[in-house]
């Protein structure tokens, strides 16, 4: 298994290939996001039995166990458990950037730019210089180089940080491109951060270990509560002094936790038990993507992991058909996760077929602006 994680006994109820007779969890039919995953029965038991030390005083055993495990998994000196992916990204950004003026380069579809409530401006006072990738999949080293602001011209805000997101819209930023971007950043002594909320998916899809991906970044944020089904939390990794600085900001941002052991224990369980299940999730997504294309539906980006992004689809009809069929969608982005069942996949395929049939004749049906959205 990519990511160098050794799986212990996996719960049958979670394994997609065995779900014909397995327990259905609440989000079995929910394709809105992999954030909808819920703790399993075994994870809840682990949480109940977790340590109850104080995290702020650095006395919680299970929190420390998670941080040591992830630091080793990623090949970094230290790790820090945080409450969310947004907090993890913002702690890393703030810890990298010390004194304005400074600017950040990222993909124009990036979570840090679009989905974090303007936190970069609030907390770091940086401007963002986004790039729209010419290949429509991921930004390249050449595009980043053309966007760099170097030198001492006082008219401009110098580039202080480059941020990549992997996966982005379900597409994998290839390792060779990550390496080229890392080389560019190092050449100009600019730190490189990875929003790795779904780096687990990138590792599985590309058969590249988490450690190898992380080796190219100065800091990485990894989410535990999306596809891995932990209830709460992300974890950031980097050099020891960097994590020490981030710990100050975590406290300042209200992220200091007390009895965090139950959440950390769930996070560690999610890596060891649920990470290996992502391969089957990707198979479902690719199966549906291929079926959609056979119906004449175009994809916004290639389906390489757990997302199918539909382009030429009537979203109003799509969501109406989904509602009538008993599955949950909220837009043209379809997200698969470890608690989606085979039955739900088949229902989804029928929904796509009926949508194509209806939109060919019911051309008067149009979604209102803002009626449907793409979540995260």
Swiss-Prot record:
Q: In which pathway does it act?
A: Amino-acid degradation; L-threonine degradation via aldolase pathway; acetaldehyde and glycine from L-threonine: step 1/1
Q: Where is this region: Disordered?
A: 1-22
Locations of Polar residues compositional bias? Answer: 1-21
Q: Its Enzyme Commission number?
A: 4.1.2.48
Q: Record keywords: Chaperone included?
A: no
Query: According to the UniProt record, what class of enzyme is this?
Result: lyase
This enzyme catalyses: L-threonine = acetaldehyde + glycine; L-allo-threonine = acetaldehyde + glycine
Q: Which cofactor does it need?
A: pyridoxal 5'-phosphate
* GO process annotations (BP): glycine biosynthetic process; threonine catabolic process
Which molecular-function annotation in GO is an example for this chain? L-allo-threonine aldolase activity
Q: What keywords are annotated for this sequence in UniProt?
A: Lyase, Pyridoxal phosphate
Give a GO cellular-component term: nucleus
Q: Which InterPro entries does UniProt cross-reference here? A: ArAA_b-elim_lyase/Thr_aldolase, Low_specificity_L-TA-like, PyrdxlP-dep_Trfase, PyrdxlP-dep_Trfase_major
**Sequence positions bearing N6-(pyridoxal phosphate)lysine:** 226
- Provide the assembly information: Homotetramer.
> Member of which family?
Belongs to the threonine aldolase family.
Q: Which PANTHER family match?
A: L-THREONINE ALDOLASE (PTHR48097:SF9), L-THREONINE ALDOLASE-RELATED (PTHR48097)
Report what the protein is called. Probable low-specificity L-threonine aldolase
Identify the species of origin: Schizosaccharomyces pombe (strain 972 / ATCC 24843)
